């Protein structure tokens, strides 16, 4: 009996310890920030503008508690639609200290339309994820997963990454995290690539950036999915994203930034 009590107490302490590690101190953004991007695609060594993207953060309520709602919308142009249709909307709700609460993704990519949803629940037993995924008219796939580490979706992880302190990283450092999607929750990595000065040729603005890569596991190998450049200042604004796609490569460059937290 005594041994069982110790095990139960240890499990509760582990769970509460995990929950205590989830919040992060956010000093990079606040509600009201709006970022717009131009999208470019590489075709036979030539870069073409193929669409736009917008990222917006607002302070709101989620089930009665203060929260951030952040969304990322990508839209291909009519010209690009002749070759590949792209209409993605990703939305996440987090607490004000960037603990994920809810995530959805609706994506029209080519002829495939998919819907994803992740609902996060936190309690003494750990963190439970209610996952939902559907592609085209296929049956809805549902799954419930319990994890002991803090999970993140694509958008909430990007928000958390904006609070990273670049002075504490060395080139090659790896940040492990759980990536939650509609189909599954898997261990992934963000790799710190170092500092780099980047000039946006379309706006003629030069940025001092911290560079990170999101790396995805494929069996025993790793695949670099997105490399993102964030300003090396208090705002840590993503000013450039390099996307490594199955059908080529694409880039997103910051066009305008409004409502930034630190002037």
Model-predicted segments: where are they?
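Bacterial N-terminal signal peptides that target proteins for export
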Residues: 1-8
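Short, linear, compositionally biased motifs with a strong N-terminal bias
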Residues: 11-12
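N-terminal signal peptide c-region/cleavage motif recognized by signal peptidases
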Residues: 15-17
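Acidic, serine/threonine-rich low-complexity disordered tracts
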Residues: 21-122, 164-263
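Hydrophobic, well-structured mid-protein blocks that either form specific transmembrane helices
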Residues: 116-159
């Amino acid at each position: 009996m005594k041994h069982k009590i110790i095990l139960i107490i240890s499990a509760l302490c582990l769970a509460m310890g995990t929950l205590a590690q989830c919040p992060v101190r956010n000093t990079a953004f606040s509600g009201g920030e709006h970022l717009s991007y131009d999208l470019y695609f590489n075709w036979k060594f030539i870069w073409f503008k193929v669409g736009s993207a917008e990222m917006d953060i607002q302070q709101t309520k989620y089930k009665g508690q203060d929260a951030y709602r952040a969304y990322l919308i990508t839209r291909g142009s009519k010209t690009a639609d002749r070759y590949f249709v792209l209409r993605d909307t990703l939305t996440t709700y987090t607490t004000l200290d960037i603990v994920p609460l809810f995530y959805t993704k609706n994506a029209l990519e080519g002829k495939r339309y998919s819907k994803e949803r992740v609902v996060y629940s936190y309690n003494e037993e750990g963190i439970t994820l209610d996952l939902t995924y559907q592609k085209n008219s296929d049956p809805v796939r549902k799954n419930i997963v319990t994890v002991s580490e803090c999970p993140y979706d694509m958008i909430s992880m990007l928000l958390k990454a904006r609070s990273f302190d670049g002075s504490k990283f060395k080139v090659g450092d790896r940040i492990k995290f759980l990536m939650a999607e509609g189909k599954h929750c898997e261990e992934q990595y963000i790799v710190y690539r170092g500092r780099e000065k980047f000039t946006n040729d379309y706006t003629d603005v030069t940025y001092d950036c911290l560079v990170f890569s999101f790396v995805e596991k494929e069996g025993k190998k790793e695949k670099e999915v997105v490399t993102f450049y964030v300003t090396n200042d208090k705002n840590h604004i993503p000013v450039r994203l390099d996307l490594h796609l199955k059908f080529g490569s694409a880039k997103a460059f910051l066009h305008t930034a409004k409502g930034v937290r630190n002037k």
